[in-house]
């Protein structure tokens, strides 16, 4: 059942000068829901009222209101996520980017990314979105092992993701990412090695690898609770991470964030904005935005989202304004995950003392005036942050 949420009025927003500005666009559509996924996505059976075209109209209305509120700043990155953006098809994705251009100033060197599922892409799709101005594609590979794909409820064939990446490259994309998941119950070391090798051999310049997390309320969580599947083991997850890192490093990829590796120049600029103090407007059902010291989030259900925008009102469900302590905590939490490291100047005297203990434990190294996670430190990044912050 959908309950109408009263929209909340956002305070005035003042983008910080000199910081990159991005736009995130959330596509809430999926043909089926993967068992591990807790993202804000909906299948056709769950929606009924909101077609892709009605959603596009609502999104256009939000972008118009956003541009008016912000005085149309220059956009350096655009990221279309989901859900399954590729379900829209190439023409609708082209329209989506035109909508951003209609309401904002798109920088000449803007990075424009879209997520895609391998089973809903084909060469003409990639040709269409490349011609429209997209510069980067991120494909959900997860694994090449049939048993792993089955456990994750993925519907593409084992070789389809790598083939899709090859098609994207052939149609002119120089920046292509493949997402992997490691630690799935039933996965072997060999399954993971073959998956990493397949990603490298596809010719991509970026690989993301995430440990499987059993999210509350998902089909996977119910299977684990019933004893049908074992929960991921922390020691196994650490070993698998090391396998990924070693395999990618040997292939010429370098880590630049704990879960992300790339060839030189292949970093995802939009995601770097999230981790390194950037600002963005999040448009679409359930999307989050962050500008100045204000973070906000939209209503989640696409029907409610469209209804509110039909009244020319921003569909904001809530917001918070971060004080100095919260901003500092986020700064440490995010920057410590980056290869460029955490500037010592950002730490207070007590935090520097605690950092010495972490350095002595071999979890951090000095790189000039910055603290950078060691290989072992990356496995314990959350614990490092907790120690630094006390």
Swiss-Prot record:
Keyword Metal-binding assigned: yes
Q: What broad class describes the main subcellular location of this protein?
A: cytoplasm
Which residues are in the Radical SAM core domain? 15-254
Binding of S-adenosyl-L-methionine 1, residues: 24, 82, 115
Annotated S-adenosyl-L-methionine 2 binding sites: 83-84, 142, 154, 179
List the residue ranges forming a coiled coil, or say none.
Answer: none
> Which GO molecular function, any one, fits this protein according to its record?
coproporphyrinogen oxidase activity
Q: Name one GO biological process term.
A: porphyrin-containing compound biosynthetic process
Q: Which domain of life is it from?
A: Bacteria
**InterPro entries recorded:** Aldolase_TIM, Coproporphyrinogen-III_oxidase, Elp3/MiaA/NifB-like_rSAM, HemW-like, rSAM
Residues holding [4Fe-4S] cluster: 30, 34, 37
Q: Which SMART domains match?
A: Elp3
Give cofactor(s), names only.
[4Fe-4S] cluster
Alphabetical keyword list: 4Fe-4S, Chaperone, Cytoplasm, Heme, Iron, Iron-sulfur, Metal-binding, S-adenosyl-L-methionine
Q: Where in the cell is it found?
A: Cytoplasm
Its cellular-component GO annotations read: cytoplasm
**PANTHER family documented for this protein:** COPROPORPHYRINIGEN III OXIDASE (PTHR13932), RADICAL S-ADENOSYL METHIONINE DOMAIN-CONTAINING PROTEIN 1, MITOCHONDRIAL (PTHR13932:SF5)
Q: Which family does it belong to?
A: Belongs to the anaerobic coproporphyrinogen-III oxidase family. HemW subfamily.
Q: What does this protein do?
A: Probably acts as a heme chaperone, transferring heme to an unknown acceptor. Binds one molecule of heme per monomer, possibly covalently. Binds 1 [4Fe-4S] cluster. The cluster is coordinated with 3 cysteines and an exchangeable S-adenosyl-L-methionine.
User: What further note is attached to this protein's record?
Assistant: Was identified as a high-confidence drug target.
State the name under which the record lists this protein: Heme chaperone HemW
Name of the gene encoding the protein in the UniProt record: hemW
